[in-house]
Amino acid sequence: MKKTFNLFIIALSLMVAFSTTAFAVEWPQEDFNNDAFNSYFGQNVSGRISTSLVFSDPAEVKAMKDGKILIVMADVSDDSEFFPSTLGNSVIVCHDDDLISVYANLDGESVQENVENKKSLKEGEIIAETGNSGWQETRSNLEFQIIDLQKSAAINPKILLPRAENEIEFTMTGIMLQNKDGKLFDIRENKVYPSGLYKVFQTRNKIAAPYKTTVTINGVVVDEIAFDTVGQENGKLYLIGKKKYESKDLYPDENLLLLGEMMLTPGRSTLGLTVQNYLGKIKQQSYVISIY
């Protein structure tokens, strides 16, 4: 039977039932290195900030840790921002540390075989095989989400799960400055700017997203955007920098990623840009610019 659930509201209603404890989690699939994903948490997916990790290959799906089965769903569409697309056959598990984990785009028959009559799961216990039941119609890819009930936010699985041995190489290319009127300037070709508020963009990687981006002026941090959690306010998802950045701010089109905002004042300044991945590896660039 098909039903529609506002999963985030359901999750929030369970907050009082669980206490906060230390936790350790395991990956829901065996392969979690750099080629194991189609899309990172925080990426631009159909004009939204993704709250999921999307895996690239079919595989067995396992429970990330001990928990109680909250919902088993078949071809369910949810209209909340945290779950904006068809989840397909999905299993949602509630854990004793104010987290819920969501395993979506599963094979319906294997869901029935593995969890239909169960009330709880042990860490590493098989939930199902991946399927083609969700929005990813062409591949059997797991869509995996973690929601923190205390923070009312989606948590990047990469900051909770065991660290991978390698990550997709994240490069800094195509640096652009955008003024308040929306005009873009290629920083390689423009070294002189009128004073004012500017956004700094780079060319977007279509799969990977950084862990953190930092913008400095003369060595002073003026903005820093973290890709560790996605919050929700007034029906809109956002990442936190010096302010709350929505999808339209972070990804104004399919090709750009926001690194941060800055106020340029008259004089000669050094603009510093840093991106950091989940292994702590950083890429840095600096530019000397003149402002009038």
Residue spans for each PLM region:
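A glycine-anchored, Pro-Gly-centered beta-turn/N-cap motif
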Residues: G196, G260, T265-S269
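Bacterial N-terminal signal peptides
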Residues: I9-S19
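Bacterial N-terminal signal peptides that target proteins for export
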Residues: M1-I9
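Exoplasmic/lumenal beta-rich domain surfaces
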Residues: P84, I100, G108, T216-M263
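A structural signal for beta-strand boundary/capping segments at domain termini and interdomain linkers
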Residues: I100, G280-Q284
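Surface-exposed, glycine-biased beta-strand/turn segments
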Residues: T20-N89, C94, K122-E123, N132, ...
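Short histidine-centered loop motifs in beta-beta connectors
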Residues: S56-P58, K62-A63, H95-G124
